[in-house]
C-alpha cells in the first residue's frame, strides 16, 4: 500500500510539474507577444514624433514667408500663403495638447478668447486672418502681431523634440479632433473671416489618418475588420473633400459648400470617429 501511495504521489507531482511547464510556456508566449506589441507601439510613436517634427519644421518655414509678406505689405501673397501654411499646423493638431500654452497663442479664435474674457490677449494666425480678410489692411498692429506669431512658431519648433507624445495621446487626440470637426468646425467657425475651412479639414483628416496608418499593422493583427472599417470611412471623407478641390491644388471657399454637403461631411466624419475610437484595442 505504501508503494502504491508513493507511486501515486510521484505521478501526481510529475503531472503537476508538466502542467507548470505548460503554464510557463504559455506565460512566456504571452510575454513575448506583449513585448512585441510594445515594441511596435514604440516604433509607431517614434515615427509619429518624426512626422510631427517635419510638419512643425515646414510650419515654421511657411510662417517665416507669411510674416515676410506682411512686412512687405503684400496682401495677395499673405492671403495665398495663409491656408497652405496653416495646414502644417492642422496636421499636427491631434497632439496639440502637448503644445501647452503655445497652441492658443498660435491658433486661438476670437470667440474662444471672448468666452474666457481674454480678448485683449488674442494673438496668432486668426487675429492676422481678421486683419487680412475682414479689415482688409496691413498696419503696424498687424506687423507686430506677425512678429509675435513668428516668435511663437520658433518656440514651438524648438520644443518639438521634447514633446511628450504617447500612443494614448495620439489615439485620443485624433478622435477628439475629428469630433471637433464634425460638431463645431463644420459650421465654419474656425476660418470665420477667410472661409478657408476646407484646407483645415483636409489637414485634420490627414493628421488623423497618419496615426491610423502607423498603427494599422498592429490593429490588423488584433481586429482586421475594424481596420478595414476605418480605412473605408477615411476614403469616404476624402472623397467628399475632393469634390471641392479647385484647379490650383487648393480648395474652394467654404461658403460654396452646400448645406447638404456640410451635413454629409459631418455625418461621414462622425461615421469615421466611431470605429476610430475603438483603435485603443491595440494598447490592450
From Swiss-Prot:
Topology in membrane: Lipid-anchor
Chain residues carrying a lipid of type N-palmitoyl cysteine: 18
InterPro entries on file: EfeM/EfeO_iron_uptake (IPR050894), Imelysin-like (IPR018976), Imelysin-like_EfeO/Algp7 (IPR034981), Imelysin_sf (IPR038352), Iron_uptake_EfeM/EfeO (IPR053377)
Pfam family, one: Peptidase_M75
Keywords: Cell membrane, Lipoprotein, Membrane, Palmitate, Signal
An annotated GO cellular component: plasma membrane
PANTHER family registered for this protein in UniProt: IRON UPTAKE SYSTEM COMPONENT EFEO
Protein name: Efem/EfeO family lipoprotein
Protein species of origin: Staphylococcus aureus (strain MRSA252)
Lineage summary: Bacteria, Bacillati, Bacillota, Bacilli, Bacillales
Amino acid at each position: 500500500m505504501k508503494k502504491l501511495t508513493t507511486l501515486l504521489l510521484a505521478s501526481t507531482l510529475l503531472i503537476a510539474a508538466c502542467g507548470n511547464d505548460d503554464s510557463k510556456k504559455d506565460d512566456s508566449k504571452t510575454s513575448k507577444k506583449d513585448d512585441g506589441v510594445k515594441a511596435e507601439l514604440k516604433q509607431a510613436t517614434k515615427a509619429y514624433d518624426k512626422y510631427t517634427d517635419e510638419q512643425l519644421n515646414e510650419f515654421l518655414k511657411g510662417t517665416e514667408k507669411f510674416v515676410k509678406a506682411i512686412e512687405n505689405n503684400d496682401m495677395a501673397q499673405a492671403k495665398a500663403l495663409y491656408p497652405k501654411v496653416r495646414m502644417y499646423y492642422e496636421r499636427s493638431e491631434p497632439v496639440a495638447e502637448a503644445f501647452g500654452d503655445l497652441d492658443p497663442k498660435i491658433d486661438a479664435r476670437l470667440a474662444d478668447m471672448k468666452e474666457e474674457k481674454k480678448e485683449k490677449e488674442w494673438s496668432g494666425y486668426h487675429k492676422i486672418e481678421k486683419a487680412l480678410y475682414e479689415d482688409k489692411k496691413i498696419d503696424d498692429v498687424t506687423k507686430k502681431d506677425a512678429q509675435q506669431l513668428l516668435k511663437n512658431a520658433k518656440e514651438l519648433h524648438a520644443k518639438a523634440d521634447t514633446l511628450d507624445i504617447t500612443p494614448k495621446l495620439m489615439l485620443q487626440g485624433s478622435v477628439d479632433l475629428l469630433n471637433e470637426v464634425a460638431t463645431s468646425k463644420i459650421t465654419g467657425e474656425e476660418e470665420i473671416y477667410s472661409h478657408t475651412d476646407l484646407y483645415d479639414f483636409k489637414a485634420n483628416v490627414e493628421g488623423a489618418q497618419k496615426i491610423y496608418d502607423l498603427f494599422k499593422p498592429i490593429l490588423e493583427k488584433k481586429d482586421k475588420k475594424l481596420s478595414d472599417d476605418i480605412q473605408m470611412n477615411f476614403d469616404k471623407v476624402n472623397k467628399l473633400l475632393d469634390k471641392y478641390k479647385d484647379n490650383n491644388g487648393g480648395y474652394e471657399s467654404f461658403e460654396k459648400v452646400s448645406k447638404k454637403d456640410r451635413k454629409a461631411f459631418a455625418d461621414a466624419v462622425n461615421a469615421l470617429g466611431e470605429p476610430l475610437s475603438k483603435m485603443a484595442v491595440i494598447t490592450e
